[in-house]
């Protein structure tokens, strides 16, 4: 049974809940359009290096953490979609 890939938006949602801050307020603090965070939270947008750097500063995590989440998500999706087609 294939595992469900974890999008960076799921982790961001957890971090927002833990810190008690809204996506809109965080967007203002890290100086990005709120829609960017809303789209990441909805799994409709990928994590970018710019956003990863800004989130890392706010949450005290490395930017690599956020980028690795994105990379792992994309690889998991590719594995599921391509299955055994690539040998």
For the regions a protein language model found, what residue spans apply to each?
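A short, Lys/Arg-rich alpha-helix, primarily the initiator
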Residues: 1-21, 68
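Short, contiguous, well-ordered secondary-structure segments
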Residues: 15, 38-41
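The alpha-helix within a helix-turn-helix
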Residues: 16, 27, 56
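Short alpha-helical DNA-recognition segment
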Residues: 21-39
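The DNA-recognition helices of helix-turn-helix-type DNA-binding domains
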Residues: 33, 44, 59, 70-73
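Short, basic-rich loop-to-helix N-cap that marks the start of a DNA-contacting helix
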Residues: 44-57
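Short, charged recognition helix plus adjacent turn
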Residues: 65-87
């Amino acid at each position: 049974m294939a595992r469900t890939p974890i999008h960076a938006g799921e982790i961001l949602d957890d971090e927002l809940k833990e810190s008690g801050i809204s996506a809109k307020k965080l967007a203002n603090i890290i100086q990005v359009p709120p829609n960017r965070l809303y789209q990441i939270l909805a799994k409709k947008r990928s994590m970018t290096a710019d956003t990863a750097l800004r989130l890392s500063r706010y949450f005290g995590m490395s930017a690599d953490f956020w980028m690795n989440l994105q990379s792992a998500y994309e690889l998991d999706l590719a594995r599921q979609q391509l299955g055994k087609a690539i040998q």
